[in-house]
């Protein structure tokens, strides 16, 4: 955002001064990244991972070639909110991506996320030994032809229960759903 331009230099200096912290930079504005890197950037810093968001195939095909050419040592892809099927094979096969995350649409959004879409990207990540995190189902999740309306409070838990994680962090049997208030969904 252009509103951030006035303090961007200070942020870059802070990132440079703190190699002990990993900075996760995420954007959907692929075309602005190169012009906003500091003059001293070179081929990037070890403590920075650049992540581009891609909600559909069109955006993936627009943004990911840009990210492939940018000088970052660590790169990732965030498919969120994933609103249609996406194929990442041609990008993952380059060996330049370390992590892919997938999430459905939340808050006021009701566009569905299909389990088959998530599984396809998961399989692509496993094929190339790339970390994969299914972050959440979104409000509307479709699996095996059945539609599930999932409150925000349960979306991460349900994603973890799918065991679509690479590497697998939790086994489905180990994930407990904490009791929640039926009205506000807060944990007891």
Residues of each region from the PLM?
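Core AdoMet radical
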Residues: 1-36, 40-85, 97-114
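Auxiliary Fe-S-binding modules of radical SAM enzymes
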Residues: 83, 89-188
């Amino acid at each position: 955002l252009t509103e951030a331009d006035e303090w961007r230099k200070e942020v870059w200096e802070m990132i440079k001064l703190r190699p002990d912290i990993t900075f996760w930079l995420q954007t959907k504005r692929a075309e602005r990244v190169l012009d906003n890197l500091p003059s001293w950037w070179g081929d990037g810093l070890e403590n920075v991972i650049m992540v581009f968001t891609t909600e559909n195939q069109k955006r993936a095909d627009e943004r990911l070639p840009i990210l492939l050419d940018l000088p970052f040592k660590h790169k990732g892809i965030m498919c969120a909110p994933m609103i249609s099927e996406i194929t990442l094979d041609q990008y993952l096969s380059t060996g330049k991506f370390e992590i892919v995350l997938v999430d459905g649409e939340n808050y006021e959004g009701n566009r569905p996320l299909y389990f088959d879409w998530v599984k396809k990207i998961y399989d692509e990540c496993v094929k190339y030994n790339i970390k994969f995190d299914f972050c959440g189902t979104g409000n509307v999740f479709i699996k095996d032809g059945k539609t599930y309306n999932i409150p925000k409070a349960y979306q991460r838990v349900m994603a973890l229960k799918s065991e679509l994680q690479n590497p697998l962090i939790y086994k489905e049997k180990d994930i407990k759903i904490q009791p929640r208030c039926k009205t506000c969904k807060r944990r007891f």
